[in-house]
Amino acid sequence: MNRKTKFFALIFGLILAQSLFNLLSAQISGKWHGKLIINEKTNLTVAFEIKGNKAGNLSSVMHSVDQKAFNIPVDTVYAEGNDVTIIINSLAAKYTGQLINKDGIDGHMAFPGGAQMKLDLQKVDRFPFSIAERPQEPKEPLPYFSDDIEFLNKKLGIKLKGTITTPSKEGQYPAVVLISGSGASDRNQTIFGHKTFLVMSDFLTRAGFAVLRYDDRGAAESEGSFLSATILDHAEDAAYAVDFLKSREFVDTLSIGLIGHSLGADIAPVTATINPSVSYVILMAGAAKPLQEIILEQCDAIYPTMGISDSATTLNKDILQSLFEVVRVAPDTKVAREQGALILKQFEERASALTQEDKNLIGYSTPLDIKTWSGLFIPYMKHDLFHDNERYLKQLKCPVLVIGGNKDLQVLPHHVKLIEDILVSNGNKRVTAKIYPGKNHLLQDAITGSPSEYGDIENTIAPDVINDIIHWLRTQTGRIPRIN
């Protein structure tokens, strides 16, 4: 074969490969939904909207329909042959499946700790559900600047991607870093179909503040490993975010603060000890106690709203306490998982005595399966379960706003007072604390406060809460006029 023939053969091969790729892209593109099988009695409706461009590249969002969590960002979608892979970093989840025909995919969703759940997808022209409206999400055109950025964790050399919003490129503005809660969050802290940090950054920037929000380490576009990143690691990332803000000419470097939500409120005090440039801190729905205690409190608060009996609640708390100790003393997560499986055997008799309804509601299989508690065997849990929040709260000497809702079932409202007492008793005289009546863990206006309601509530954050945050920030910074 001469050079010319080889050249045309190569070009033909590339064209053929691209044509096949585009054909596969077209076949995968569309609306897909199915049932994620949690156990024999429990499943969740999951859907994907997959789009392909002219180059054959795929993108997608995910909907967890029963949880009212819509438009969850998908980080990677690719197809090769009949194999389909979808990666959702914010859930630390990976879907793998095979096309069985033009309208069907057989597959599984994998989660941290080795959990594998069956998820077969069917292609449809229209979803049999509606996507909730989110009236607080900003609409273009925006009356401020929004720029995608990246900053470096210099210690590890990993790039963290995010967005900075600024009232103007002229003058200098007080600034805040938003620190997300548990789970691999994207920069918007997308949860139950709400983009909490997108909405907050919009309100705050319109009020005259520069705002930096970013994808967690290992989530969405940021580099690094989320599964091994502890509270201390995330605090370090946030400290580098503060340094990044200090390098921006439109930021008042003497007025940079932190706003942490949920676990982010546990991270923020650590960040403030790492980076002395932090001028003020807002703790939203944060905890005064270690995560292991918060999880047990959640059982007592949430299980009754689900109809779970006292005996089932007590059993699960006993199992959790035993597994916490296993995680604490085991040298690594693999050993902890193996030892945890053995520990479960001593609870089999009590679990068997539960009603079938309790088993279904709490997610127990028979016999007990360690996969039910797989979330405890993620590497970062060895630290985070036992992280001493009080140690770092005691070191906060800057102005602090502590807020929570009296219908918060994830971090109970008494933690607002506990945090306030810790701060004040250690000499901080610039503490403001408030418990909002009728507000849940997301600081929304709630009915019961149950997490199952989050997605049903249209507003992402209650207007009175965000207005109070803005007022408090202005009090600390001495400015700024509102923009429209």
What is the role of each PLM region?
Residues 128-171:
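N-terminal cap/lid segment of alpha/beta-hydrolase-fold proteins
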